[in-house]
């Protein structure tokens, strides 16, 4: 009799995705981040569900309800901080996952890559809306500043912003709809993640060498299940260390002050994982130009497959491209630092140089160096 695992319609899907899946024998720890993102998403949905049981999306009570969760609800504090820091872990894994894709040429799988970009946008939107919910100072002013960017769109901008706000300023209507969207989006992300996997399993995984691994496959279980479990344990170790020892390390002290439309905080800034994009936005003195640069800073990923000029897929055997890649990483870290600094000299010029360098590396230097490397191999 054939194993039920291979015949039952539901079990068969699980089996072909996580058990009998043929996987390359040489994929490194950089391939762990997909499963870690899945764990982060499940963790965020679960902690978020328990938070939603006690949270009220009303301007008068939102801040108090979060305080109530932390003070009065059984283990409410740990649920709240796991959710807040879980978002940080989510983005760390996301950046590593995208970085891996760039380094090893995973973007050659176009459908998988493009759905990944949609997932990135959806996750960023969800995180932004979630940051508004505690209704602290940074929640309110962050929501005001970021939604206001849409007013830069010609002709329809102002109407669009007021439509999103549900009024003439960020208020009760805005908070209620942000809560509704923040609740539904993770489920949309989960559905998209399944489509992401569906397209990945059409082609099979890439591997560090960038060479086809069809002749050397191993079953996903037990080799990569045990490897994923190790990754998950390390993720939980880092997350729980953060939650239990310094839960507010990555947060903003301003968000412990209730939202006040009459008092603007000295430095409005988003969570750390948006600072690189925020720095790019601020580095352009024109409002519409800044918004376009902000959108393009992420959307540029969609152009990467068309800018791939190398004869090799991976950067594993391309030392010049490797140098550029790590320069890009350093540049993104610089942008992240600048995004958290006040708009004054010398931070303005550093941010502008770093922003120009970011687009130059991706659009000009990477394709050029790849062509040079191709020519160096003709000997």
Curated annotation (Swiss-Prot):
<feature type="binding site" description="axial binding residue">
    <location>
        <position position="196"/>
    </location>
    <ligand>
        <name>heme b b566</name>
    </ligand>
</feature>
<dbReference type="InterPro" id="IPR048259">
    <property type="entry name" value="Cytochrome_b_N_euk/bac"/>
</dbReference>
<keyword id="KW-0408">Iron</keyword>
<feature type="binding site" description="axial binding residue">
    <location>
        <position position="97"/>
    </location>
    <ligand>
        <name>heme b b566</name>
    </ligand>
</feature>
<feature type="transmembrane region" description="Helical">
    <location>
        <begin position="77"/>
        <end position="98"/>
    </location>
</feature>
<dbReference type="InterPro" id="IPR005797">
    <property type="entry name" value="Cyt_b/b6_N"/>
</dbReference>
<keyword id="KW-0813">Transport</keyword>
<dbReference type="Pfam" id="PF00033">
    <property type="entry name" value="Cytochrome_B"/>
</dbReference>
<feature type="transmembrane region" description="Helical">
    <location>
        <begin position="178"/>
        <end position="198"/>
    </location>
</feature>
<feature type="transmembrane region" description="Helical">
    <location>
        <begin position="288"/>
        <end position="308"/>
    </location>
</feature>
<feature type="transmembrane region" description="Helical">
    <location>
        <begin position="320"/>
        <end position="340"/>
    </location>
</feature>
<protein>
    <recommendedName>
        <fullName>Cytochrome b</fullName>
    </recommendedName>
</protein>
<comment type="subunit">
    <text>The cytochrome bc1 complex contains 11 subunits: 3 respiratory subunits (MT-CYB, CYC1 and UQCRFS1), 2 core proteins (UQCRC1 and UQCRC2) and 6 low-molecular weight proteins (UQCRH/QCR6, UQCRB/QCR7, UQCRQ/QCR8, UQCR10/QCR9, UQCR11/QCR10 and a cleavage product of UQCRFS1). This cytochrome bc1 complex then forms a dimer.</text>
</comment>
<dbReference type="GO" id="GO:0006122">
    <property type="term" value="P:mitochondrial electron transport, ubiquinol to cytochrome c"/>
</dbReference>
<keyword id="KW-0999">Mitochondrion inner membrane</keyword>
<comment type="similarity">
    <text>Belongs to the cytochrome b family.</text>
</comment>
<keyword id="KW-0479">Metal-binding</keyword>
<comment type="function">
    <text>Component of the ubiquinol-cytochrome c reductase complex (complex III or cytochrome b-c1 complex) that is part of the mitochondrial respiratory chain. The b-c1 complex mediates electron transfer from ubiquinol to cytochrome c. Contributes to the generation of a proton gradient across the mitochondrial membrane that is then used for ATP synthesis.</text>
</comment>
<feature type="transmembrane region" description="Helical">
    <location>
        <begin position="113"/>
        <end position="133"/>
    </location>
</feature>
<keyword id="KW-0679">Respiratory chain</keyword>
<feature type="transmembrane region" description="Helical">
    <location>
        <begin position="226"/>
        <end position="246"/>
    </location>
</feature>
<dbReference type="GO" id="GO:0008121">
    <property type="term" value="F:ubiquinol-cytochrome-c reductase activity"/>
</dbReference>
<keyword id="KW-0349">Heme</keyword>
<keyword id="KW-0472">Membrane</keyword>
<feature type="binding site" description="axial binding residue">
    <location>
        <position position="182"/>
    </location>
    <ligand>
        <name>heme b b562</name>
    </ligand>
</feature>
<dbReference type="InterPro" id="IPR036150">
    <property type="entry name" value="Cyt_b/b6_C_sf"/>
</dbReference>
<keyword id="KW-0496">Mitochondrion</keyword>
<feature type="binding site">
    <location>
        <position position="201"/>
    </location>
    <ligand>
        <name>a ubiquinone</name>
    </ligand>
</feature>
<dbReference type="InterPro" id="IPR030689">
    <property type="entry name" value="Cytochrome_b"/>
</dbReference>
<feature type="binding site" description="axial binding residue">
    <location>
        <position position="83"/>
    </location>
    <ligand>
        <name>heme b b562</name>
    </ligand>
</feature>
<dbReference type="Pfam" id="PF00032">
    <property type="entry name" value="Cytochrom_B_C"/>
</dbReference>
<dbReference type="InterPro" id="IPR027387">
    <property type="entry name" value="Cytb/b6-like_sf"/>
</dbReference>
<feature type="transmembrane region" description="Helical">
    <location>
        <begin position="347"/>
        <end position="367"/>
    </location>
</feature>
<keyword id="KW-0812">Transmembrane</keyword>
<keyword id="KW-1133">Transmembrane helix</keyword>
<keyword id="KW-0830">Ubiquinone</keyword>
<dbReference type="InterPro" id="IPR005798">
    <property type="entry name" value="Cyt_b/b6_C"/>
</dbReference>
<dbReference type="GO" id="GO:0005743">
    <property type="term" value="C:mitochondrial inner membrane"/>
</dbReference>
<dbReference type="InterPro" id="IPR048260">
    <property type="entry name" value="Cytochrome_b_C_euk/bac"/>
</dbReference>
<dbReference type="GO" id="GO:0045275">
    <property type="term" value="C:respiratory chain complex III"/>
</dbReference>
<dbReference type="GO" id="GO:0046872">
    <property type="term" value="F:metal ion binding"/>
</dbReference>
<dbReference type="InterPro" id="IPR016174">
    <property type="entry name" value="Di-haem_cyt_TM"/>
</dbReference>
């Amino acid at each position: 009799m054939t194993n039920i695992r291979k015949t039952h319609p539901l079990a068969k899907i699980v089996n072909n995705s996580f058990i009998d899946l043929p996987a390359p024998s040489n994929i490194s720890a950089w391939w762990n981040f997909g499963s870690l993102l899945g764990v982060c998403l499940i963790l965020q949905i679960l902690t978020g569900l328990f938070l939603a049981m006690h949270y009220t999306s009303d301007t008068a009570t939102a801040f108090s309800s979060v305080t109530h969760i932390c003070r009065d609800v059984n283990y409410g504090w740990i649920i709240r901080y796991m959710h807040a820091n879980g978002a940080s872990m989510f983005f760390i894994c996301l950046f590593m996952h995208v970085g891996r894709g760039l380094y090893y040429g995973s973007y050659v799988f176009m459908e998988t890559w493009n759905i990944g970009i949609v997932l990135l946008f959806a996750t960023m939107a969800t995180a932004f809306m979630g940051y508004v919910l505690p209704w602290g100072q940074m929640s309110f002013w962050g929501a005001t500043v970021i939604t206001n960017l849409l007013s830069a769109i010609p002709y329809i901008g102002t109407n669009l912003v007021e439509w999103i706000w549900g009024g003439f300023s960020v208020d009760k209507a805005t908070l209620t709809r942000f809560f509704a969207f923040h609740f539904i989006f993770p489920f949309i992300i989960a559905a998209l993640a399944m489509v992401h996997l569906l397209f990945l399993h059409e082609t099979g995984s890439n591997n560090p060498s960038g060479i086809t691994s069809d002749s050397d496959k191993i079953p996903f279980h037990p080799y990569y299940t045990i490897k994923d479990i190790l990754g998950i344990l390390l993720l939980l170790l880092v997350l729980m260390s953060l939650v239990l020892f310094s839960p507010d390390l990555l947060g903003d002290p301003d968000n412990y002050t209730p939202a006040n439309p009459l008092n603007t905080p000295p430095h409005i800034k988003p969570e750390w994982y948006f600072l690189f994009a925020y720095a790019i936005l601020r580095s352009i003195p024109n409002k519409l130009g800044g918004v376009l640069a902000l959108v393009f800073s992420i959307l540029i990923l969609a152009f990467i497959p068309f800018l791939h000029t190398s004869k090799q897929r991976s950067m594993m055997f391309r030392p010049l491209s490797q140098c550029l890649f790590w320069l890009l990483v350093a540049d993104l870290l610089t942008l992240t630092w600048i995004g958290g600094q006040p708009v004054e000299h010398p931070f303005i010029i550093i941010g502008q140089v770093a922003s120009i360098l970011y687009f130059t590396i991706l659009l000009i230097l990477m394709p050029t160096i790849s062509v040079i490397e191709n020519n160096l191999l003709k000997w």
